[in-house]
Design a protein with these regions (language model features):
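Surface-exposed, interaction-prone regions used to assemble/regulate multi-protein complexes
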Residues: 1-135
């Protein structure tokens, strides 16, 4: 993945309107020879309408979850924000623990739930967002 593609992916992810959208599901699966992480969402649109959506993290290699399910429920499954990074403390930590694994071309996708909901971290090469998908 070249720098231009990485930058475009980061910008595309960070441009999504995350605040007060809802995290309603999480799934791990394998397709086309790669690991994938799917999150089912209800994306908040103009006028407060919620639209079902699915986000697929493609070519995923690591996931770290710190989710308080009761806190998530109490806060109506709301997402606070989300960000994508080319490099982060988490990716540096993974590299130190696994010096023989190459994480070149991987991006750190992080979703923050409304406190005390927690965080979801995914190390993947790309993502796709399908609006109107069943949740």
């Amino acid at each position: 993945m070249n720098t231009q593609t990485i930058d475009a992916t980061i910008q595309r992810f960070n441009a999504i309107r995350w605040h007060d959208s809802k995290l309603v599901g999480l799934c791990f699966y394998r397709a086309e020879g790669e690991e994938r992480v799917k999150i089912s969402l209800e994306m908040l649109g103009e006028g407060g309408a919620l639209t079902p959506a699915e986000m697929i993290f493609e070519a995923s290699t690591y996931v770290a979850l710190d989710v308080d399910l009761e806190g998530k429920r109490v806060c109506s499954d709301d997402i606070s924000s989300a960000e994508c990074y080319a490099s982060s403390e988490w990716t540096k930590s993974l590299s130190e623990k696994s010096p023989y694994d190459s994480f070149e071309g991987y991006l750190h996708f992080r979703l923050y739930l409304i406190p005390p909901g927690g965080t979801i971290n995914v190390l993947a090469k790309d993502f796709s967002l399908e609006m109107g998908a069943p949740g």
